[in-house]
Regions:
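Glycine-enriched, solvent-exposed interface loops adjoining structured elements
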Residues: 1-192
Length: 192
């Protein structure tokens, strides 16, 4: 279901006029979409974010492949910060890497870092673009491919034709609940 269709489904439930055609560009930059429709669009994104966090949806899974470099410990995942790592597999050897704490990685490096096939990974901040970085232990001594299986939330919906990746019904109903709370039609109950 597209972003415009999602907005229209909420508007129908609110007995409001729907958006008859796609807008061009981002919704907030469009002069053809009313302010109220933009509010409903924002509530769709709020609801989408909540639904995405409730489950590890298959449609949100991605694989980030990292090629190691001999003697290099730190790697950039180039995937943003709001991800969940489900599994890490060394595609070269078939071994699964285990997540460890930064404290553990700091402990095992004295007097020098161990070298060999990576068995562990730990988070080590982010780069200037807010992409997560990981340290490997032992430090690789050869080129290997590590596959990080991640859950990554879909970017906020802004374009009319963007298709939602998670189930639409809970997103629609969540946005509708937020909309009736915003209008004061919820009978005084709290909505989240």
């Amino acid at each position: 279901m597209t972003y415009r269709e999602l907005i229209n489904q909420v508007l129908i439930r609110l007995r409001e006029d729907t958006i008859s055609s796609d807008w061009s560009g981002a919704i907030n930059d469009s002069s053809t979409v009313s302010a109220y429709h933009k509010v409903i669009g924002a509530l769709i994104n709020d609801s989408k974010r909540s639904i995405e966090s409730y489950h590890d949806w298959l449609n949100l899974r991605e694989t980030v492949s990292v090629s190691t470099v001999s003697g290099t410990k730190n790697y950039n995942l180039s995937s943003g910060q709001e991800i969940k790592i489900v599994d890490v597999i060394n595609a070269t050897t078939g071994m699964h890497l285990n997540q460890v704490s930064k404290v553990y990685l700091n402990t095992v490096k004295y007097p020098t870092d161990d070298t060999g096939e990576p068995l562990y990974y730990g988070f080590n901040g982010s780069d200037s673009s807010n992409n997560l970085k990981v340290d490997l232990s032992p430090v690789p001594t050869s080129v290997q491919t590590l596959n990080f299986e991640i859950i990554k939330h879909q970017d906020a919906l802004t374009l009319a034709a963007t298709v939602l990746k998670v189930p639409s019904q809970p997103v629609i109903l969540g946005a509708w609940a937020r909309a009736i709370a915003e209008r004061g039609e919820d009978g005084g109950t709290q909505s989240s």
